[in-house]
Amino acid sequence: MDYRVEKDTIGEIQVPADKYWGAQTQRSKQNFPIGNEKMPVEIIKAFAILKRSTAEANFELGLMERDKMEAIQYAADQVLNDSLTDHFPLVVWQTGSGTQSNMNVNEVLAFVGNKWLQEQGSDLKLHPNDDVNKSQSSNDTYPTAMHIAAVLKLEDTVLPALSQLKNTFAEKQSAFENIVKIGRTHLQDATPLTLGQEISGWHRMLEKSETMISESLEHLRELAIGGTAVGTGLNAHPDFSEKVCKAISTFTNKKFISAKNKFHSLTSHDETVYAHGALKGLAADLMKIANDVRWLASGPRCGIGEITIPANEPGSSIMPGKVNPTQSEAVTMVVTQVMGNDAAIGFAASQGNFELNVFKPVIAYNFLQSSQLLADSIISFDERCAVGIEPNHEQIEKNLNDSLMLVTALNPHIGYENAAKIAKKAFADNSTLKETAVELGLLTEEQFDEYVNPEEMTYPK
């Protein structure tokens, strides 16, 4: 392999000749051979958005030549169109401020930008620190990149997926609104409801999650940029932060604002904890929905079997003809991972010592992983399971007629204790509620039919 020699304040170091990174990236690559978890591409692209915006702000403030700004923006755009993916090799497990990934971006943008400047016939030369990182510190750029990446991921990936499944449930709710089935509480038979009503609960869960995620976005829109090293803004123009946030907003077509208190935004990640809490809430709802679906579809002959779901693949390597609720199982595993990520994020966010939290990369990694897993699993569950949910009318009717909890409708007419007598005796004798009520002399057949109407029980007057 051919090498070139790069140097930093530590000294000289060999860098592969075909790579665009510099000395600090190479040192990090050698010093942290830990795991396979690369710095998320969403963070790298967020950095690219940030760097092209800081260059614009520095130019507008008279702190940078136009050619240098354009060179940085050209290089940043190459990152955004995935042309430079191979030049960002660093793992998550590095310095807790993300300094080495900030420098990785600075070095690559300087390298590519300098090639562009040469092609333009310019004598100017970009320096990773003095130009690409001008008016910045890793301490304010990394949390800024975290928030940019989080907002983009939630708005462009998670919320559209959530809306897709929510719309499917709205359609199923309407289609099944008149199918009366038995309800269940404590895993035991309860009073009737319609299948549409049951699914309406799932729909409302997703509506609430959508609202909570959207609310959390407002806090993530605050950016730390301009705080530099400890929050004071040393070496940054007083108007730098506002101009950068405006440039980011214009470029992304999304709202971003300068954080009110930069001391807070460097050492605290409560906004990310809050936003991931909303994702955890969504995950909890998805666990409930996925479990309900697989229980209701259990069988086909010896389970509840009140709905059918698509048969996407063979379910067993030993039992012929078996079909399993695999989409539900995938969702529940994703939920498990998200719950674990939430614990990691919460602990990491609690470790802000003095002016800086140094758990930033692991917070970003887990947040973005949760977001992507949730979005992917929601879409997969929707397209390969939810849209294909259909009622099993025969089983629904059988379970409804077999339920002893229809006796609840008799409470206003014969009292709770007499209704309980009917239910207990019917269960013991394996007889129907009507037969038992008549046998006990508590009701006539006509009275029973008048009082016990499952359809009317689902919409009581």
Curated annotation (Swiss-Prot):
The keyword ATP-binding does not apply. Disulfide bonds: none annotated. The record marks E329 as: Important for catalytic activity. GO terms for cellular component: cytoplasm. The active site is at H186, S316. Transmembrane segments: none annotated. Keywords: Cytoplasm, Lyase, Tricarboxylic acid cycle. Pfam families: FumaraseC_C (PF10415), Lyase_1 (PF00206). GO terms for biological process: fumarate metabolic process; malate metabolic process; tricarboxylic acid cycle. Pathway: Carbohydrate metabolism; tricarboxylic acid cycle; (S)-malate from fumarate: step 1/1. It is an enzyme of class 4 (lyase). It catalyses: (S)-malate = fumarate + H2O. Substrate binds at residues 97-99, 127-130, 137-139, 185, 317, 322-324. HAMAP family: FumaraseC. NCBIfam families: fumC_II (TIGR00979), PRK12273.1 (NF008909). Belongs to the class-II fumarase/aspartase family. Fumarase subfamily. Homotetramer. This is Fumarate hydratase class II. The lineage of its organism: Bacteria, Bacillati, Bacillota, Bacilli, Bacillales.
